[in-house]
Curated annotation (Swiss-Prot):
<dbReference type="InterPro" id="IPR036259">
    <property type="entry name" value="MFS_trans_sf"/>
</dbReference>
<feature type="topological domain" description="Extracellular">
    <location>
        <begin position="144"/>
        <end position="247"/>
    </location>
</feature>
<feature type="transmembrane region" description="Helical; Name=8">
    <location>
        <begin position="320"/>
        <end position="340"/>
    </location>
</feature>
<feature type="glycosylation site" description="N-linked (GlcNAc...) asparagine">
    <location>
        <position position="194"/>
    </location>
</feature>
<feature type="transmembrane region" description="Helical; Name=10">
    <location>
        <begin position="380"/>
        <end position="400"/>
    </location>
</feature>
<comment type="similarity">
    <text>Belongs to the major facilitator superfamily. Sugar transporter (TC 2.A.1.1) family.</text>
</comment>
<dbReference type="InterPro" id="IPR020846">
    <property type="entry name" value="MFS_dom"/>
</dbReference>
<keyword id="KW-0762">Sugar transport</keyword>
<feature type="transmembrane region" description="Helical; Name=7">
    <location>
        <begin position="275"/>
        <end position="295"/>
    </location>
</feature>
<feature type="topological domain" description="Cytoplasmic">
    <location>
        <begin position="269"/>
        <end position="274"/>
    </location>
</feature>
<keyword id="KW-1133">Transmembrane helix</keyword>
<comment type="function">
    <text>Probable glucose transporter.</text>
</comment>
<feature type="topological domain" description="Extracellular">
    <location>
        <begin position="24"/>
        <end position="29"/>
    </location>
</feature>
<feature type="transmembrane region" description="Helical; Name=9">
    <location>
        <begin position="354"/>
        <end position="374"/>
    </location>
</feature>
<feature type="topological domain" description="Extracellular">
    <location>
        <begin position="82"/>
        <end position="87"/>
    </location>
</feature>
<feature type="topological domain" description="Cytoplasmic">
    <location>
        <begin position="1"/>
        <end position="2"/>
    </location>
</feature>
<dbReference type="GO" id="GO:0055056">
    <property type="term" value="F:D-glucose transmembrane transporter activity"/>
</dbReference>
Amino acid sequence: MGLIVSIFNIGCAIGGIVLSKVGDIYGRRIGLITVTAIYVVGILIQITSINKWYQYFIGRIISGIGVGGIAVLSPMLISEVAPKHIRGTLVQLYQLMGTMGIFLGYCTNYGTKNYHNATQWRVGLGLCFAWATFMVSGMMFVPESPRYLIEVGKDEEAKHSLSKSNKVSVDDPALLAEYDTIKAGIEIEKLAGNASWSELLSTKTKVFQRVLMGVIIQSLQQLTGDNYFFYYGTTIFKSVGLKDSFQTSIIIGVVNFFSSFIAVYTIERFGRRTCLLWGAASMLCCFAVFASVGVTKLWPQGSSHQDITSQGAGNCMIVFTMFFIFSFATTWAGGCFVIVSETFPLRAKSRGMAIATAANWMWGFLISFFTPFITGAINFYYGYVFLGCLVFAYFYVFFFVPETKGLTLEEVNTMWLEGVPAWKSASWVPPERRTADYDADAIDHDNRPIYKRFFSS
């Protein structure tokens, strides 16, 4: 059963890598429609399976392939269409819709819990056809990426796309300036030709550094331990008398969903780096309390007597579970997708995002598959593993993840090429906006000891 559930993540990893190029060839919108169709095929295979576990298994993989493509192409399209001042907010909405889907899934499971036949799981799968229909219908109204249109020589369509996104006329001076900036950046990239998979290892153009950062950030999103809570939360709730796992799921889903609304504001108000740093710090504190109370207080007579629990300890752990989910949903849940969608140059974007997102799915598979075995062996000591990962996440973000708030995608690329230290990136100014008192050398280089960089930034 664990493999059937977690194999979905493997399909997602495959789909992101294999299907990401569809968006480069046929456009982001057609790409999204295509991968959604693949997702529907997977759902259809699952819902028609009767006493054939292998058919359901295959359907899970195929639907995962479709979702993997969506996870790459959707943030990609949003980041390329959105105006820079709300780009983070709009990419964050991708995560918000994901949490809404999780919440609705929990509600559906609760509504069908009294069925004891195939109806219980087929209703939830059947609703997936509705979400796919909404997705395809929505693509009819979304403008195509102006960067893709310029790349394939459809300049006038690109201007109309920018016009629609910014709600200004095609002749607006600001729009034309943005168009010229995008076109100039694409022309420079065209001189180097299309990026190959091997070029993702290039350090000269800083592509490898960006791929590495994307992989680590997406991996750390899973290693924050959020899925640990979604899996193990029912055990804690049982300790205080709430034994219905369906109700437990809804409570967690409500906190997760409504916390994501706050992230829509914070990601643009405070910036990507700040959100990730504060998120890692707050989740670290939550795990320290959660794991320590679980190890020392939840079972007064030891883990061998799990039927005897401390309600006070259970209540404390539930409170910090909710704090953790709030901290995760408002920072790392969508923040890593925002940063990855803004980081890569256009010519390497689909491949770079695919690799980074695949890392997320692979860690999702490993955690969902092995968590039952690990928690069965070491119980709440498992929390200290994630605590250690969060310590690493905090320092990694501080030293290696630059701020991209308020910059165009072309300006983000310039910042990477200049080699601006991550802890100084919030002060970096694009060349065309620099004044006489701007000290580029002071921003681009920092010879201070590491501890001084950390405490003075």
